[in-house]
Amino acid sequence: MKPENKIPVLTRLSDEMKAVVNFQQPGLPPWPADGDIETQRQYYLLERRFWNADAPSMTTRTCAVPTPYGDVTTRLYSPQPTSQATLYYLHGGGFILGNLDTHDRIMRLLARYTGCTVIGIDYSLSPQARYPQAIEETVAVCSYFSQHADEYSLNVEKIGFAGDSAGAMLALASALWLRDKHIRCGNVIAILLWYGLYGLQDSVSRRLFGGAWDGLTREDLDMYEKAYLRNEDDRESPWYCLFNNDLTRDVPPCFIASAEFDPLIDDSRLLHQTLQAHQQPCEYKMYPGTLHAFLHYSRMMTIADDALQDGARFFMARMKTPR
């Protein structure tokens, strides 16, 4: 689709979203478009420092968890001494960017709003690590904490997964992996998904939206996919194209959040419609006037904070519901 035919989303954003788009961090250099992947990772970390400031204080603990691929760093956020459940968080970044620091504020707010321990998983990034390594690392982390719950004062009878963007795919894929492989490391009571991609190769929203402002042009999406997958056959894997998995049974309750002007919004819509058609518990909410990745900007956007609180409420409600 010619770029000129796309919807001019920058004129339709909410005032809060426009303020973020137009905000210039003092002293921040331009995005290193021609830099190597490590340079871009360092820039992303630097750029996110402002957005992670002024986050709630709480007890945190770092733990290196053994996995088949080597140790994976995790960070435990404990808002109170005891927790009714444990929520595992997978950060976004197109599978190639991001770490526990780039999403620190999001995890702190989730811990605060749920009152539960949140465990951030610093899974290995692509292209150095390819599918399904990040999923298998996540499953290994869950199994480890299931076996060492007392040591970390965790309640792993009830667990959940959460993630944004690529992390949302990893969150849902990990939960389905546990189900499909019959791995028990707690009762998955909910999955919180913010503007994820779930396997569509094309869609109306991918044609209408996406540009330099969000890093989600067709070329960008192709690049992320090629970095993550081992080969083209992986595109049809049921833990990458999640619509090729069985979504008709035993899917944990899903909170599905989308951004109005996100090229990936049709992934969320289709996931919701599929689960709803097969009586799988789910809730869908679209946040008007927003772009992909808006969850990061809660320092300037009340709707970002609202989206986190909505997910937290969904999770807390499932803590009280027998399943």
From Swiss-Prot:
Job of this protein? Displays esterase activity towards short chain fatty esters (acyl chain length of up to 8 carbons). Able to hydrolyze triacetylglycerol (triacetin) and tributyrylglycerol (tributyrin), but not trioleylglycerol (triolein) or cholesterol oleate. Negatively regulates MalT activity by antagonizing maltotriose binding. Inhibits MelA galactosidase activity.
- Quaternary state and interactors: Homodimer. Interacts with MalT and MelA.
Q: Which family does it belong to?
A: Belongs to the 'GDXG' lipolytic enzyme family.
Swiss-Prot/TrEMBL keywords: Cytoplasm, Hydrolase, Serine esterase
Localization (cell): Cytoplasm
Query: What lineage does the source organism belong to?
Result: Bacteria, Pseudomonadati, Pseudomonadota, Gammaproteobacteria, Enterobacterales
| One Pfam assignment | Abhydrolase_3
Instruction: Kindly state one GO CC term assigned in the UniProt record.
Output: cytoplasm
User: What is this protein's record name?
Assistant: Acetyl esterase
Catalytic positions are S165, D262, H292
EC number(s) recorded for this UniProt protein? 3.1.1.-
The molecular function terms in GO held by this entry are: carboxylic ester hydrolase activity
Question: InterPro entries, from UniProt?
Answer: AB_hydrolase_3, AB_hydrolase_fold, Acetyl_esterase, GDXG_lipolytic_enzyme, Lipase_GDXG_put_SER_AS
User: Per its UniProt entry, what is the enzyme's top EC class, as one word?
Assistant: hydrolase
| Sequence motif Involved in the stabilization of the negatively charged intermediate by the formation of the oxyanion hole, residues | 91-93
Q: Does the keyword Hydrolase apply?
A: yes
Predominantly, its location class is cytoplasm
Q: Which organism is it from?
A: Salmonella agona (strain SL483)
Q: Could you confirm whether the keyword Hydrolase appears in this record?
A: yes
